[in-house]
Curated annotation (Swiss-Prot):
Role: Part of the dynactin complex that activates the molecular motor dynein for ultra-processive transport along microtubules. In the dynactin soulder domain, binds the ACTR1A filament and acts as a molecular ruler to determine the length. Modulates cytoplasmic dynein binding to an organelle, and plays a role in prometaphase chromosome alignment and spindle organization during mitosis. Involved in anchoring microtubules to centrosomes. May play a role in synapse formation during brain development.
Gene behind the chain: Dctn2
Family label: Belongs to the dynactin subunit 2 family.
Segments of skewed composition (Acidic residues): 18-27
Modification N-acetylalanine occurs at: A2
Residues recorded with modification Phosphothreonine: T134
Membrane topology: Peripheral membrane protein
Record GO biological process: melanosome transport; mitotic metaphase chromosome alignment; mitotic spindle organization; protein localization to centrosome
Subunit structure: Subunit of dynactin, a multiprotein complex part of a tripartite complex with dynein and a adapter, such as BICDL1, BICD2 or HOOK3. The dynactin complex is built around ACTR1A/ACTB filament and consists of an actin-related filament composed of a shoulder domain, a pointed end and a barbed end. Its length is defined by its flexible shoulder domain. The soulder is composed of 2 DCTN1 subunits, 4 DCTN2 and 2 DCTN3. The 4 DCNT2 (via N-terminus) bind the ACTR1A filament and act as molecular rulers to determine the length.
Keyword Phosphoprotein: yes
Phosphoserine modified-residue sites: S83, S321
Protein name: Dynactin subunit 2
Cell compartment(s), UniProt: Cytoplasm, Cytoskeleton, Microtubule organizing center, Centrosome; Membrane
Domain of life of the source: Eukaryota
Amino acid sequence: MADPKYADLPGIARNEPDVYETSDLPEDDQAEFDAEELSSTSVEHIIVNPNAAYDKFKDKRVGTKGLDFSDRIGKTKRTGYESGDYEMLGEGLGVKETPQQKYQRLLHEVQELTTEVEKIKTTVKESATEEKLTPVVLAKQLAALKQQLVASHLEKLLGPDAAINLADPDGALAKRLLLQLEATKSSKGSSGGKATAGAPPDSSLVTYELHSRPEQDKFSQAAKVAELEKRLTELEATVRCDQDAQNPLSAGLQGACLMETVELLQAKVSALDLAVLDQVEARLQSVLGKVNEIAKHKASVEDADTQNKVHQLYETIQRWSPVASTLPELVQRLVTIKQLHEQAMQFGQLLTHLDTTQQMMASSLKDNTALLTQVQTTMRENLATVEGNFASIDARMKRLGK
């Protein structure tokens, strides 16, 4: 029996099964929930494409030659993996930089310095204090230093005598080539053809390879032609006037191009000659007379047609007058005949239903007659069997009584 102190508490359901409710999901469904997306601007959402990453690092190997990740006791640092855009050596490694590594390091440092100077130029305000290097002057010096670095890189590729202006590298290379040719000609003239057959070839000779790209030339030529056609189309669209349907002078002046429009205008202007105008005026006078005759004939024809239609309408009304008097009686008779037709249709449906019912009853009687005949035959057979059984029982009783 329950404790009586809980008998009169509010909110207790009596004579009902106990139900324990909770807002939590079952244990099997607790892990299945949608992750709450972070909408903060401080969180950077990075979309990673696994297929692209796999294609980028496919068939790549990590070189472990010269690497040492073991612990150390001395002051010498061990060589581990180095990562970055450029391979730059740290201090104290005891490894000498190659010229390529030194050039990349200097170029990277100049780029970092340029970025810092640009930040200073945007943030620092004008001040009255005098400085030795202002951000503007420092930026100019950095640009010159970067140009020198790039020029030194080109000198390493093209030779120590390469003096190329970065503003126009193609023109500078052409000038350099002409200077080399002039120097070669002067050296040949000074030698005077005294070289012997067994003498080695002159090492100061310069060999150039000219690479022509006809596809690039064709592409640039096609681009220029397309640009010219585009400008010509814009010019034609600007000069060409839109055709006005209300203006008879502008009819037929919508040419496909500017030349066609000019030819059409020239043909129209040539049609304004005095001799041509006299011929046109004579033709217009004859045409005007014919038009007036056609208008008069058309008016007479229209009047005759109107009179004919009026006579036909009057005859139709005369024929309709006796029919109109008998129309109400005809409508009443048609309504009565409609009701008779509906009753006849219902009677026909009843006859059809009665015929169908009679056929069903006849078929049922045939089935019942067949069943009755079968039952009578079965009863006769059963009665004969019962009589035979009683006769055999009487015979046995008589034998037993004797």
